[in-house]
Every structure is written in C-alpha cells, then in structure tokens.
Amino acid sequence: MNLVDLWLTRSLSMCLLLQSFVLMILCFHSASMCPKGCLCSSSGGLNVTCSNANLKEIPRDLPPETVLLYLDSNQITSIPNEIFKDLHQLRVLNLSKNGIEFIDEHAFKGVAETLQTLDLSDNRIQSVHKNAFNNLKARARIANNPWHCDCTLQQVLRSMVSNHETAHNVICKTSVLDEHAGRPFLNAANDADLCNLPKKTTDYAMLVTMFGWFTMVISYVVYYVRQNQEDARRHLEYLKSLPSRQKKADEPDDISTVV
C-alpha cells in the first residue's frame, strides 16, 4: 500500500469517526432537550412522543427541530396562542383524546402553512375562533367533538384548504337550528346557510309590536264601554226626571177645574 492509499484510508476513517461523533452529539443534544415525561428519537427527523404522560398543558420546552409531535391521550384542556411558533419543521401534530375545550385565535401561528397532519379528534371542542385555522393546509381530523353548528363553524371550515375532508365527519351536537342537532354538518350546511338566517330579534320586535297594538285595542274597548255606561247613566237620570216635571206642569189645570 503506497502512501497515497494509506492517507486516503486514514482520511476516510477520520471522516467516519467525525461523522459518528457529530451524530452522537446531536442525539445527546436532542435527548437533553426532550421535555419531561416524553421520549425523543431522531428517526426521520426529531420525533417527540408525549402520549399518556398525564400532561395537563402543552410543554413549552419543545425542541425547535421537532418534526413529529405526539401529545395524545393526556389531560390537556386548551391550546394557547403561539404555543408552536418556534417549531418551524413540525409536520405532524397529534392532540387527540384529550379534554381540549378552548383553542385560541393564534394557536397554530408559525406552523399553519407547514403542518401536514393535525389530529384534534375525541376532545370537548364545541366552537373555535373563526380565525383559529386560517391558512391551515394540514389534513385535519376534528371528529368526535361536541360541535355547535353555527355561522362561526361554517366560516372556520371554509377557511381550511382541506375543508371537505375535515367537515365530512363533523356531527352537530347542537345547532342554531334545533332540527340540525345530531346531524352531520355537511347536511346542515346544505339545507341552510348558517350565516344567513333570520335573526330572532325580528321575532321579538314583532311580538312587542303586536303586544302594543293589543294593549291599545283593549284600552280603547275599556274606554268605549265606560263612556257608554256613563252616557247610559246620564240618559237614565234624565228619563227619571221627566215625570216630576210633567206633574208640575199639570197642577194649574186641576185647580182651574175645581174652581
């Protein structure tokens, strides 16, 4: 083996050793940044698994290079504003089987355009801010939540790129129209535009108007009856006074007859 071959062999060995060392450092760095109660691995990008970890809130010390994040089967109740804003490489986010009730307006700011899969199924979500899913390009799963079907939900689903697939399994637990309760959202939306419904205030205005007219009619009837009673009383008194006046007028004739 000549010197050139020996040098190349040693150089290659050093490169492989250096590469292994760098990978070890990266793995150690990722492990050291792994949130408490979670498991982190570097298979195909940094995977952070926090499933069944009894978490009551989303960890705030998530590694910025996280690609897959599993937070399912915990006790998380809300998704705060900008909680994922530093996770620019995040592709998969699983928040299913929690107790999520509230999603803030800017909860997915920073990851809305890069996220590919979002799982919010099996939670307690009834409604969200109309801008909560703005620019979200992910395939979202939001089934098995007690959704209240109204104009806001209609706007939310329309703002999502994959809205038809997302809305397909949404069932209205309650609705602005009682007849839609228990029905799929798509059926309810096809039957009526939930953002163009007659306002109930119109019915109240009509009721107030009718009550006003009814009060006026009753008042007029009462006044009319009382007025007639008063006129009848006066007329009766007048009639009662007539005989006495007639008698006084006849008295001189009786006297002259006697004379």
Curated annotation (Swiss-Prot):
The chain crosses the membrane at residues 205-225. InterPro entries: Leu-rich_rpt (IPR001611), Leu-rich_rpt_typical-subtyp (IPR003591), LRR_dom_sf (IPR032675), LRRNT (IPR000372). The keyword Hydrolase does not apply. Residues 34-64 form the LRRNT domain. Keywords: Glycoprotein, Leucine-rich repeat, Membrane, Repeat, Signal, Transmembrane, Transmembrane helix. LRR repeats lie at residues 65-86, 89-110, 114-135. PROSITE patterns: LRR. Residues 145-197 form the LRRCT domain. Its main location: membrane. One of its GO terms (cellular component) is membrane. It is found in: Membrane. It is a single-pass membrane protein. Pfam families: LRR_1, LRR_8, LRRNT. The keyword Transmembrane helix applies. Glycans are attached at residues 47, 94. SMART domains: LRR_TYP (SM00369), LRRNT (SM00013). Residues 1-33 form the signal peptide. Belongs to the LRRC3 family. This is Leucine-rich repeat-containing protein 3B. It comes from Bos taurus. The gene is LRRC3B.
